[in-house]
Design a protein with these regions (language model features):
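A short alpha-helix-loop-beta-strand transition element characteristic
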Residues: 1-7, 104-106, 194
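Active-site-adjacent segment of FAD-dependent monooxygenases/related oxidoreductases
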Residues: 1-9, 13, 22-36
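Short loop/edge segments at beta-strand edges and connector loops
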Residues: 6, 55-57, 199
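Short, solvent-exposed loop/turn elements at beta->coil junctions and helix N-caps
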Residues: 11, 59-61, 200-205
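A short, glycine/Asx- and small/polar-enriched loop/turn
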Residues: 14-22, 63-70, 207-211
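Helical element adjacent to the flavin cofactor pocket in flavoenzyme catalytic cores
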Residues: 25-84
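Central helical "cap/lid" subdomain
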Residues: 76-124
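Active-site lid/adjacent beta-loop-alpha segment flanking the redox-cofactor pocket in flavoenzymes
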Residues: 120-212
């Protein structure tokens, strides 16, 4: 369903985008979901289906039985065993997978998010910048939600002088990161120039070395 569109069609779909946008990839079947309500929905439905959840239960290792991953060992020594084990621990999956001899090259990316005050209806689609400066959408009640990587999260302390390479785990936000992200957003959506930010936060994203 994905196709490339020119500036004219971009403006037909999103008239509030600035002239900075001269083309885009467009997928009419794309969408977005509120992560809080979606996660809660999955959780409630899983409970109805008999799923049990264990919180505050850090995983120490996986273990194979007859060549197949069957056991999950917790830090306190508790062992769970099943026919199928699914590893979905984000960046921490790498350390857990290493316990069975598998290494998945991964790194952590810092992502800063912000929510604006309620705005007039402007945009119906999920959108983002190809250079990954920001991505976002307008909610049903009018606020905009954006995620961004401004490039200003780098600090001198994250560079190991012996190798001259950066340690992504030492990325931090600072007084420049949010304002830099806002400037990028304003350049593409000028109508948000005077919008107030209701709240912002940041967290880690996991990324494999192949960019997935």
């Amino acid at each position: 369903d994905v196709r490339m569109i020119d500036e004219k069609e971009v403006k037909e779909i999103c008239p509030y985008l600035s002239d900075e946008v001269i083309g885009a990839s467009w997928c009419p079947t794309d969408g977005h979901a509120n992560p809080l309500t979606t996660t809660l929905g999955y959780y409630k439905r899983a409970l109805e289906m008999g799923v049990r959840f264990y919180t505050d239960a850090p995983v120490k290792a996986l273990q194979k039985v007859k060549g197949k991953v069957r056991k999950v060992i917790l830090n306190d020594g508790t062992v769970f065993e099943g026919e199928t084990v699914i590893l979905v621990a984000g960046y921490e999956s790498r350390e857990i997978a290493r316990t069975i001899g598998i290494d998945i090259p991964m790194t952590r990316l810092i992502d800063e998010c912000l929510v604006t005050e309620m705005q007039p209806h402007m945009i119906d689609v999920m959108f983002g910048c190809a250079t990954a400066d920001f991505y976002g959408h307008q909610t049903h009640h009018g606020s905009f939600v954006f995620g961004s990587d401004s490039g200003w999260e780098v600090v001198d302390e994250m560079v190991d002088p012996s190798t001259n390479t950066a340690d992504p785990s030492k990325l931090i936000t600072n007084s420049m990161t949010l304002s830099a992200s806002c400037r990028a957003i304003q350049s593409y959506i000028p109508a948000l120039r005077d919008a107030k930010i209701v709240r912002s936060w940041c967290g880690w994203l996991d990324e494999a070395f192949d960019g997935v």
